[in-house]
Amino acid sequence: MKKGIHPENYREVLFYDGSVQQGWIIRSCAATNKTMVWEDGKEYPLYPLDTSSASHPVYTGKRREANTEGRASKFNERFKGISSLTKK
């Protein structure tokens, strides 16, 4: 392997999906300042995931309710009165 072509921070990182309490240790350059002790007793840099193949409905076949309102509905709520002002 050539020297000096790989990033300095290439190391084992724990990617952890908190919604299903499942994680994977993968070699990565992901930037993070959090750490977590894993099942093997070692401490790894932690990269938290909102969703993964373990929790995404496409992969699990289960339906999941979103607990946050989408960007489009927030936009529509904010500007719902504008259309009545511009129509003549």
Swiss-Prot record:
Pfam families: Ribosomal_L31
GO molecular function, one term: structural constituent of ribosome
Gene Ontology terms: biological process: translation
UniProt keyword list: Ribonucleoprotein, Ribosomal protein
Gene3D superfamilies according to UniProt: Ribosomal protein L31
Listed name of the protein: Large ribosomal subunit protein bL31B
Gene: rpmE2
GO CC, any one term: ribosome
Signal sequence bounds: none
Family from the record: Belongs to the bacterial ribosomal protein bL31 family. Type B subfamily.
Subunit structure of this chain's protein: Part of the 50S ribosomal subunit.
Lineage: Bacteria, Pseudomonadati, Pseudomonadota, Gammaproteobacteria, Pasteurellales
